[in-house]
Design a protein with these regions (language model features):
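Bacterial N-terminal signal peptides that target proteins for export
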Residues: 1-8
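Hydrophobic helical h-region of N-terminal Sec-dependent signal peptides
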Residues: 9-13
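C-terminal motif of bacterial Sec signal peptides marking the signal peptidase cleavage site
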Residues: 15-18
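Bacterial signal peptide processing site
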Residues: 20-23
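Terminal, regulation- and interaction-focused segments at domain boundaries
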Residues: 29-61, 69
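A cross-family detector of function-defining hotspots
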Residues: 63-103
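Amphipathic N-proximal alpha-helical interface segments
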Residues: 89-123
Length: 125
C-alpha cells in the first residue's frame, strides 16, 4: 500500500509547482529586480513608477503600462477605497512564491494621487 501513495505525491507536486510563472516578466519595469532583497526590489519598482507617473498623471495610462509590464489589474469592485486600484503579478508557485503588488489612489478626475509598490513573498501556510 505504501508504494502506491508515492505516486500520489508526484501529481500534487506538479500541480503546486507548475501553475505559476517561474520569474518576473522580462519587461523594463522589472529589469534587475530579481536577485535583490524584497525591500530593494520594492524601492526599484517604486522609483521607476514614481518617475514615470508622478502625481497628476493619468490613471488610465498607469493601468495600461502596468498591463504591458505583465501585471493584472484587479476588478474595481474589489477595492475598499473609491478612486483606488491594485495590480499584481505572482510567480514561483501558488503556495510559497513571490509577488509584486502596485496600488494607487486617484482623485475624482482620474489622476494619480499616490502609487505604492510592494515586491515580497506570498506567504506560506
Amino acid at each position: 500500500m505504501m508504494p502506491n501513495r508515492r505516486w500520489l505525491i508526484v501529481p500534487l507536486l506538479i500541480v503546486l509547482g507548475g501553475c505559476e510563472p517561474s520569474g518576473l516578466p522580462a519587461t523594463p519595469l522589472f529589469v534587475g529586480v530579481e536577485g535583490h532583497s524584497y525591500a530593494q526590489g520594492s524601492e526599484l519598482i517604486q522609483g521607476r513608477l514614481s518617475a514615470r507617473f508622478p502625481t497628476g498623471s493619468s490613471v488610465r495610462e498607469l493601468k495600461g503600462y502596468l498591463e504591458q509590464q505583465g501585471l493584472q489589474i484587479e476588478p474595481t469592485g474589489r477595492s475598499s477605497t473609491p478612486n483606488s486600484g491594485v495590480a499584481f503579478f505572482k510567480y514561483n508557485g501558488p503556495v510559497c512564491g513571490s509577488q509584486v503588488r502596485v496600488s494607487w489612489e486617484a482623485d475624482a478626475a482620474g489622476t494619480v494621487k499616490s502609487i505604492h509598490a510592494l515586491y515580497g513573498d506570498t506567504g506560506c501556510p
